[in-house]
């Protein structure tokens, strides 16, 4: 079992073709990618149409801060029948979150043992756009590869050893790693 934690690690694994992940993106990020594609094709009209509206410089810092996700608690829904869910008795699992990256659910219906609820924010501040991205997104994905598996985890399940509720996920990956296969 390979436990991959954090967006940068997951991106690297994806770039090296060791796993596959689909990211949910903000409207601004999608527009930026479309604008880059338009300029690469020489379509300046499409490029101009995709550029964001001009904003006052003084507002930049505040706007950027509102888009951050720093220390929120989100409502995860765990599949207690999954090997990573062993020992959990409640379907609701509060997850500590420090990142504004969100993964789409796995293409395999059995490989997303923890996903966020429809209204995930339990505590802290999160922009409406990030709440919409988090809604129904994956917190953990198991990607079976050959005789092993890669566990993709965006959240720090053992964050500073004070977030006790989710530490079992990591321990279950260690103890039940041989059971982490993708049912087809």
Task: Kindly give the residue locations of the regions a language model identified.
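Extracellular ligand-binding/catalytic regions of CAZymes and related secreted enzymes
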Residues: 81-83, 87-101, 105-184
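A glycine-rich, often tryptophan-bearing local segment used as a flexible ligand/cofactor-contacting loop or short
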Residues: 1-84
């Amino acid at each position: 079992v390979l436990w991959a934690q954090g967006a940068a690690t997951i991106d690297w694994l994806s770039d090296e073709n060791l796993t596959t992940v689909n990211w949910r993106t903000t409207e601004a990020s999608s527009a930026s990618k479309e604008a880059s594609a338009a300029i690469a094709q020489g379509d300046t009209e499409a490029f101009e149409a995709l550029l964001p509206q001009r904003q006052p410089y003084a507002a930049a810092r505040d706007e950027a801060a509102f888009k951050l996700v720093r220390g929120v608690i989100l409502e995860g829904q765990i599949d207690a029948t999954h090997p990573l869910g062993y020992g959990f008795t409640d379907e609701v699992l509060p997850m500590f979150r420090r990142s504004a990256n969100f993964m789409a659910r796995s293409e395999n219906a059995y490989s997303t043992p923890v996903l966020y609820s429809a209204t995930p924010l339990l505590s802290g501040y999160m922009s409406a756009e990030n709440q919409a991205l988090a809604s129904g997104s994956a917190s953990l994905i198991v990607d079976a590869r050959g005789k092993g598996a890669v566990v993709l985890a965006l959240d720090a399940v053992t964050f500073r050893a004070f977030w006790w509720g989710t530490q079992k996920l990591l321990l279950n990956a260690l103890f039940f790693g041989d059971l982490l296969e993708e049912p087809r």
